[in-house]
Amino acid sequence: VRGGEEPSFSALSSKNLIPNESYSPATAPLAPGTALDLSGDEPQPGAYFNYQSCTAAWSFTLADARTIAVTASHCGKPGDKVWAGTADGDFSYPAEPIGEVIYSDFYAEDSHDLDVAFIEITGSADYYVPGAVDNSVATSLAHLPLHVCKLGRVTDETCGTLIHGAAMAQLNSGGLQRDSIAARARVCSTNGDSGGPVYGEVEGEQTIVGVVSGTTQRLEEGHTCETTQTDMELSFTLATDIQVLAKEVLGPMA
Protein backbone atom coordinates (compact mmCIF):
# COMPACT_ATOMS: atom_id res chain seq x y z
CA VAL A 1 0.00 0.00 0.00
CA ARG A 2 1.40 3.45 -0.88
CA GLY A 3 0.83 6.35 1.45
CA GLY A 4 -1.02 4.31 4.11
CA GLU A 5 -0.50 1.81 6.85
CA GLU A 6 0.25 -1.82 6.04
CA PRO A 7 -2.73 -3.97 7.11
CA SER A 8 -2.33 -5.75 10.46
CA PHE A 9 -3.97 -8.93 11.64
CA SER A 10 -5.03 -10.87 14.73
CA ALA A 11 -6.17 -14.49 14.28
CA LEU A 12 -9.57 -15.51 15.65
CA SER A 13 -10.49 -18.96 14.35
CA SER A 14 -9.17 -21.77 12.14
CA LYS A 15 -10.36 -23.49 8.96
CA ASN A 16 -9.55 -26.86 7.39
CA LEU A 17 -8.14 -27.39 3.90
CA ILE A 18 -8.59 -30.21 1.34
CA PRO A 19 -6.40 -32.52 -0.88
CA ASN A 20 -3.66 -31.32 -3.28
CA GLU A 21 -4.41 -30.08 -6.80
CA SER A 22 -2.98 -27.23 -8.88
CA TYR A 23 -3.16 -25.80 -12.38
CA SER A 24 -1.02 -23.68 -14.69
CA PRO A 25 -3.01 -21.09 -16.69
CA ALA A 26 -2.77 -21.72 -20.43
CA THR A 27 -2.34 -17.98 -21.07
CA ALA A 28 -0.96 -15.60 -18.43
CA PRO A 29 -0.50 -11.94 -19.52
CA LEU A 30 1.27 -10.89 -16.28
CA ALA A 31 4.00 -12.87 -14.54
CA PRO A 32 3.67 -13.53 -10.80
CA GLY A 33 5.25 -10.60 -8.96
CA THR A 34 4.51 -7.95 -11.60
CA ALA A 35 4.53 -4.39 -10.19
CA LEU A 36 1.21 -2.53 -10.45
CA ASP A 37 -0.01 1.02 -9.74
CA LEU A 38 -3.75 1.46 -9.06
CA SER A 39 -5.86 4.61 -8.71
CA GLY A 40 -9.36 5.96 -9.06
CA ASP A 41 -7.87 9.23 -10.33
CA GLU A 42 -6.42 10.15 -13.70
CA PRO A 43 -2.80 11.39 -13.75
CA GLN A 44 -2.40 15.00 -14.89
CA PRO A 45 0.87 16.77 -15.82
CA GLY A 46 2.27 18.72 -12.87
CA ALA A 47 -0.48 17.60 -10.48
CA TYR A 48 -0.21 15.37 -7.41
CA PHE A 49 -1.29 11.83 -8.27
CA ASN A 50 -2.50 9.53 -5.49
CA TYR A 51 -2.09 5.85 -6.29
CA GLN A 52 -1.63 2.48 -4.62
CA SER A 53 1.62 0.63 -5.21
CA CYS A 54 0.95 -3.12 -5.27
CA THR A 55 1.99 -6.43 -6.84
CA ALA A 56 0.21 -9.06 -8.96
CA ALA A 57 0.05 -12.65 -7.70
CA TRP A 58 -0.73 -14.39 -11.00
CA SER A 59 -2.89 -14.02 -14.11
CA PHE A 60 -5.11 -16.20 -16.26
CA THR A 61 -7.57 -16.20 -19.16
CA LEU A 62 -11.32 -16.80 -18.91
CA ALA A 63 -13.37 -18.96 -21.25
CA ASP A 64 -14.81 -15.74 -22.75
CA ALA A 65 -11.21 -14.68 -23.64
CA ARG A 66 -10.89 -11.92 -21.03
CA THR A 67 -7.49 -11.85 -19.33
CA ILE A 68 -7.42 -11.38 -15.56
CA ALA A 69 -4.73 -10.53 -12.98
CA VAL A 70 -5.02 -11.21 -9.25
CA THR A 71 -3.99 -8.75 -6.50
CA ALA A 72 -5.15 -7.69 -3.02
CA SER A 73 -8.59 -6.16 -2.47
CA HIS A 74 -7.24 -3.31 -0.34
CA CYS A 75 -5.15 -2.23 -3.35
CA GLY A 76 -8.14 -0.96 -5.31
CA LYS A 77 -11.89 -0.59 -5.80
CA PRO A 78 -13.97 -1.61 -8.83
CA GLY A 79 -13.44 0.94 -11.57
CA ASP A 80 -9.91 1.86 -10.49
CA LYS A 81 -7.46 2.04 -13.37
CA VAL A 82 -4.26 -0.01 -13.33
CA TRP A 83 -0.84 0.91 -14.72
CA ALA A 84 2.43 -1.01 -15.01
CA GLY A 85 4.62 -0.20 -12.00
CA THR A 86 8.31 0.67 -12.05
CA ALA A 87 11.30 -0.72 -10.17
CA ASP A 88 11.77 2.45 -8.09
CA GLY A 89 8.08 2.79 -7.22
CA ASP A 90 7.66 6.15 -8.95
CA PHE A 91 4.73 6.56 -11.33
CA SER A 92 5.90 6.62 -14.93
CA TYR A 93 4.17 9.51 -16.76
CA PRO A 94 2.82 9.62 -19.39
CA ALA A 95 1.40 6.11 -19.35
CA GLU A 96 -1.69 4.35 -20.60
CA PRO A 97 -3.62 2.06 -18.24
CA ILE A 98 -3.13 -1.66 -18.79
CA GLY A 99 -6.43 -2.58 -17.17
CA GLU A 100 -9.16 -1.92 -14.64
CA VAL A 101 -10.30 -3.47 -11.36
CA ILE A 102 -13.55 -5.30 -12.11
CA TYR A 103 -14.04 -7.01 -8.74
CA SER A 104 -12.69 -6.27 -5.26
CA ASP A 105 -14.08 -8.51 -2.52
CA PHE A 106 -13.91 -6.02 0.35
CA TYR A 107 -16.11 -3.66 -1.68
CA ALA A 108 -18.56 -6.32 -2.90
CA GLU A 109 -22.16 -6.22 -1.65
CA ASP A 110 -21.80 -9.88 -0.66
CA SER A 111 -18.17 -9.98 0.54
CA HIS A 112 -16.48 -13.33 1.12
CA ASP A 113 -14.01 -11.78 3.60
CA LEU A 114 -11.12 -12.30 1.19
CA ASP A 115 -8.43 -9.70 0.53
CA VAL A 116 -8.46 -10.25 -3.23
CA ALA A 117 -9.27 -8.22 -6.35
CA PHE A 118 -9.49 -9.14 -10.03
CA ILE A 119 -8.13 -6.86 -12.75
CA GLU A 120 -9.21 -7.15 -16.38
CA ILE A 121 -6.09 -6.65 -18.49
CA THR A 122 -6.82 -4.66 -21.66
CA GLY A 123 -3.39 -3.25 -22.56
CA SER A 124 0.29 -4.05 -22.39
CA ALA A 125 3.47 -2.31 -21.26
CA ASP A 126 7.02 -2.95 -20.13
CA TYR A 127 6.46 -4.75 -16.84
CA TYR A 128 8.78 -4.78 -13.84
CA VAL A 129 9.03 -8.19 -12.17
CA PRO A 130 11.61 -8.58 -9.35
CA GLY A 131 12.05 -12.34 -9.75
CA ALA A 132 10.75 -15.56 -11.28
CA VAL A 133 7.98 -17.72 -9.80
CA ASP A 134 6.42 -20.76 -11.47
CA ASN A 135 2.90 -19.97 -12.69
CA SER A 136 1.40 -23.04 -10.99
CA VAL A 137 -1.50 -22.19 -8.67
CA ALA A 138 -3.07 -24.36 -5.97
CA THR A 139 -6.74 -25.20 -6.45
CA SER A 140 -6.95 -27.41 -3.34
CA LEU A 141 -4.50 -28.39 -0.59
CA ALA A 142 -4.32 -31.06 2.09
CA HIS A 143 -2.21 -28.59 4.05
CA LEU A 144 -0.10 -25.52 3.39
CA PRO A 145 3.68 -25.92 2.96
CA LEU A 146 5.55 -25.51 6.25
CA HIS A 147 8.04 -23.18 4.50
CA VAL A 148 6.75 -20.43 2.20
CA CYS A 149 8.17 -17.48 0.28
CA LYS A 150 6.64 -14.33 -1.12
CA LEU A 151 7.64 -12.15 -4.08
CA GLY A 152 6.92 -8.42 -3.86
CA ARG A 153 7.93 -5.40 -5.94
CA VAL A 154 9.66 -3.73 -2.96
CA THR A 155 11.31 -6.44 -0.83
CA ASP A 156 11.65 -9.02 -3.62
CA GLU A 157 11.74 -12.63 -2.35
CA THR A 158 11.60 -13.32 1.38
CA CYS A 159 10.89 -16.66 3.05
CA GLY A 160 9.97 -18.15 6.41
CA THR A 161 7.97 -20.73 8.32
CA LEU A 162 4.20 -21.16 8.34
CA ILE A 163 2.56 -20.12 11.62
CA HIS A 164 -1.01 -21.24 10.98
CA GLY A 165 -3.46 -21.99 8.19
CA ALA A 166 -6.58 -20.08 7.23
CA ALA A 167 -8.20 -18.18 10.10
CA MET A 168 -10.61 -15.30 10.50
CA ALA A 169 -8.66 -12.13 11.29
CA GLN A 170 -9.10 -8.38 11.52
CA LEU A 171 -7.47 -6.41 8.70
CA ASN A 172 -6.81 -2.72 9.25
CA SER A 173 -6.16 -0.63 6.14
CA GLY A 174 -6.68 3.04 5.40
CA GLY A 175 -8.42 3.56 8.73
CA LEU A 176 -10.98 0.82 8.06
CA GLN A 177 -11.25 -2.51 9.85
CA ARG A 178 -12.51 -5.58 8.01
CA ASP A 179 -12.91 -9.29 8.65
CA SER A 180 -10.45 -11.24 6.51
CA ILE A 181 -9.76 -14.96 6.14
CA ALA A 182 -5.99 -15.42 5.97
CA ALA A 183 -3.10 -17.75 6.80
CA ARG A 184 0.05 -16.46 8.45
CA ALA A 185 3.81 -17.05 8.11
CA ARG A 186 6.97 -15.54 9.62
CA VAL A 187 7.96 -13.63 6.48
CA CYS A 188 9.19 -10.05 6.03
CA SER A 189 7.27 -7.69 3.73
CA THR A 190 6.37 -4.01 3.36
CA ASN A 191 4.14 -1.50 1.56
CA GLY A 192 3.93 -2.24 -2.17
CA ASP A 193 4.31 -6.01 -1.77
CA SER A 194 0.56 -6.40 -1.18
CA GLY A 195 -1.08 -8.65 -3.76
CA GLY A 196 2.12 -10.56 -4.54
CA PRO A 197 2.35 -14.36 -4.74
CA VAL A 198 3.02 -16.56 -1.71
CA TYR A 199 4.43 -19.92 -2.75
CA GLY A 200 6.01 -23.11 -1.50
CA GLU A 201 6.76 -26.69 -2.46
CA VAL A 202 3.71 -28.91 -2.97
CA GLU A 203 4.44 -32.52 -3.93
CA GLY A 204 7.90 -31.49 -5.12
CA GLU A 205 6.73 -28.59 -7.29
CA GLN A 206 6.86 -24.84 -6.62
CA THR A 207 3.21 -23.78 -6.28
CA ILE A 208 1.50 -20.47 -5.56
CA VAL A 209 -0.60 -20.99 -2.42
CA GLY A 210 -1.66 -17.44 -1.57
CA VAL A 211 -1.70 -13.68 -2.07
CA VAL A 212 0.11 -11.21 0.21
CA SER A 213 -2.38 -9.31 2.38
CA GLY A 214 -0.50 -7.54 5.18
CA THR A 215 1.89 -7.70 8.11
CA THR A 216 1.72 -7.45 11.89
CA GLN A 217 4.59 -4.92 11.96
CA ARG A 218 5.84 -2.11 9.75
CA LEU A 219 9.28 -2.18 8.18
CA GLU A 220 10.90 1.03 9.43
CA GLU A 221 11.83 3.64 6.82
CA GLY A 222 15.36 3.16 5.55
CA HIS A 223 15.48 -0.47 6.64
CA THR A 224 15.27 -3.62 4.51
CA CYS A 225 14.30 -7.20 5.25
CA GLU A 226 18.01 -8.08 5.07
CA THR A 227 19.07 -5.52 7.67
CA THR A 228 16.15 -5.84 10.09
CA GLN A 229 15.72 -8.56 12.70
CA THR A 230 12.00 -8.71 13.35
CA ASP A 231 9.20 -10.97 14.53
CA MET A 232 7.06 -9.67 11.68
CA GLU A 233 4.28 -11.99 10.52
CA LEU A 234 2.84 -11.97 7.00
CA SER A 235 -0.83 -12.72 6.41
CA PHE A 236 -1.93 -14.10 3.06
CA THR A 237 -5.21 -14.98 1.37
CA LEU A 238 -5.37 -18.60 0.24
CA ALA A 239 -5.17 -19.33 -3.49
CA THR A 240 -7.69 -22.14 -3.04
CA ASP A 241 -10.33 -19.70 -1.76
CA ILE A 242 -9.49 -17.28 -4.57
CA GLN A 243 -9.96 -19.96 -7.24
CA VAL A 244 -13.46 -20.74 -5.97
CA LEU A 245 -14.33 -17.04 -5.85
CA ALA A 246 -12.98 -16.41 -9.37
CA LYS A 247 -15.27 -19.05 -10.87
CA GLU A 248 -18.23 -17.66 -8.93
CA VAL A 249 -17.85 -13.99 -9.90
CA LEU A 250 -16.02 -14.21 -13.26
CA GLY A 251 -17.08 -17.51 -14.81
CA PRO A 252 -15.11 -20.52 -16.09
CA MET A 253 -11.43 -20.31 -16.96
CA ALA A 254 -10.03 -21.15 -20.39
Predicted regions and their residues:
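Noncatalytic regulatory segments and standalone regulatory/sensor domains
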Residues: 1-60, 254
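Surface-exposed flexible segments
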Residues: 2-15, 136-139, 221-232
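Short, well-ordered strand-loop elements centered on a beta-strand within folded domains, enriched
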Residues: 9, 65-72, 205-211
